[in-house]
Amino acid sequence: MNKRTSVDASKEDLHPADPQSGEGVPPNRKNTKTSPRGEGTAPPFSARPCVWTLCEMLSILALVGVLHPFYRSNNQVYQKLKTHLRCQSSRVDGLMLKPTLLTPSQLKSPEGHLILPTFNHLVIRHILDPKQIFCVADVCTDCKFNCGSIERHQKRHLMRVSQDWEHLIRYRNQICLS
């Protein structure tokens, strides 16, 4: 079996690394054979990958430079954009950040979208108390839940909202009566 494979041929170009065999390893333990290109020649190099890498780095820096002041100056718009992009697959037509107090223009709109602390997208049917931001709502979809848990969460959320609203009505009635 004297067939030479490419692996065998490449091994012949190097000195054996076994000092016990006593052959081929120079005393200074360095491989003395030079590459076929000769000494002092640089490896083949193409400028094209470096240019593309530089362009990619510059585009990333430009993007960061553009988005960073935008993020700092208008955090609400940035958060809205980020949330919209994150949940694009959900069937939500529009997003509105949860305000601390609803303005009259927001009260007039029949259907708006609020992001409540549960991070569910809720379609407002009736705004019951603008200061407390209680609402009877339907959960459209949410990127955090699968279909089964959305249905369970929807029922639980509607029960919680209705219970909170009933509690608030009872509390107001007690205040009015006393």
UniProtKB/Swiss-Prot annotation:
It comes from the Eukaryota. Residues 1-43 are annotated as: Disordered. Residues 1-16 have a biased composition (Basic and acidic residues). This is Uncharacterized protein C15orf32. The gene is C15orf32.
